[in-house]
Swiss-Prot record:
Organism whose genome encodes this protein: Rhodospirillum rubrum (strain ATCC 11170 / ATH 1.1.1 / DSM 467 / LMG 4362 / NCIMB 8255 / S1)
GO biological process: DNA repair; glycolate biosynthetic process; reductive pentose-phosphate cycle
HAMAP family in alphabetical order: GPH_hydrolase_bact
Keyword Magnesium: yes
Residues given in the record as Mg(2+) binding sites: 8, 10, 174
Name the UniProt record assigns to this protein: Phosphoglycolate phosphatase
Name of the encoding gene: cbbZ
Active-site residues, Swiss-Prot/TrEMBL: 8 (nucleophile)
Summary of the function given for this chain in its UniProt record: Specifically catalyzes the dephosphorylation of 2-phosphoglycolate. Is involved in the dissimilation of the intracellular 2-phosphoglycolate formed during the DNA repair of 3'-phosphoglycolate ends, a major class of DNA lesions induced by oxidative stress.
Pathway the protein takes part in: Organic acid metabolism; glycolate biosynthesis; glycolate from 2-phosphoglycolate: step 1/1
Keyword Magnesium: yes
């Protein structure tokens, strides 16, 4: 049984795509650019707000999709955050079963954290507003350190904060970024199938792929009575018990 479980936020605990899409489209509209639909934005998220903005404008031939640090992208990022940060709860919802599993884990003394590329302020506001903050012991966001995922530094900082070693923790994410981060930090990792991955989740090399939190709870040894179970696809036969 892991001593700590560390979750990604967007696409793992929380469906935040509507609010991200709305803020991004407001930013695009300021430059007289057409709005993007949620399917397009979904393919752009996962590596921080800077790259989200860079990818959105690159779709219109403005800047490079892989460069979040140039002057123009930084200015666009500031405008995006001005739209998003005041109300990160807009259109956001908790994935079914997430709160129940967090509560069950915390009740058994499992230390919980969130490691996200979302800026720390909006991330904490989102957790608080959606009722997820109480069991979460710490949050490391995309601007907490100089590095962000897939660099292992944010995850390692969270391990230190929670007081656990890498092999005593489990990372739960939804994307190649989460898997790469966990592997670089030496943390076992599983992924949720419903999130914002741009690649097939079965190909990411995680220990297991879960379709819902009830199935993840079963695997962890915390079954949720009455929870909807869509299934799990283990990549390995063992569980962390």
């Amino acid at each position: 049984m892991p001593k700590a479980v560390i979750f990604d936020l967007d696409g793992t605990l929380v469906h935040s795509l509507p609010g991200l899409t709305d803020a991004l489209n407001k930013t695009l509209a300021e430059d007289d650019l057409a709005p993007l639909d949620e399917a397009a934005v979904k393919r752009m998220v996962g590596e921080g707000a800077g790259l989200l903005v860079a990818r959105a404008f690159a779709a219109y031939g403005l800047g490079r999709a892989d460069d979040a640090d140039d002057t123009a992208t930084q200015a666009r990022l500031a405008r995006f955050l001005a739209h998003y940060a005041p109300d990160p709860l807009a259109g956001a919802s908790v994935y079914p079963g997430a709160l129940a599993l967090l509560g069950a884990l915390a009740a058994r003394g499992i230390r919980l954290g969130v490691c996200t590329n979302k800026p720390e302020g909006p991330a904490r506001a989102l957790l608080e507003g959606l009722g997820l903050a109480d069991p979460i012991m710490d949050v490391v966001g995309g601007d907490t350190l100089a590095q962000r995922k897939p660099d292992p530094a944010p995850l390692r900082a969270l391990l230190d904060s929670l007081g656990v070693e890498a092999d005593q923790a489990l990372m739960v994410g939804d994307s190649p970024t989460d898997v790469a981060t966990a592997k670089a930090a030496g943390v076992p990792v599983v992924v949720m199938s419903y999130g914002y991955s741009r690649e097939p989740v079965a190909s990411l090399g995680a220990l297991a792929v879960f379709d819902d939190f009830a199935s993840l709870g079963d695997w962890l040894g915390f079954p949720q009575p009455g929870g909807d179970r869509l299934g799990a696809t283990p990549a390995l036969s063992e569980n962390p018990a």
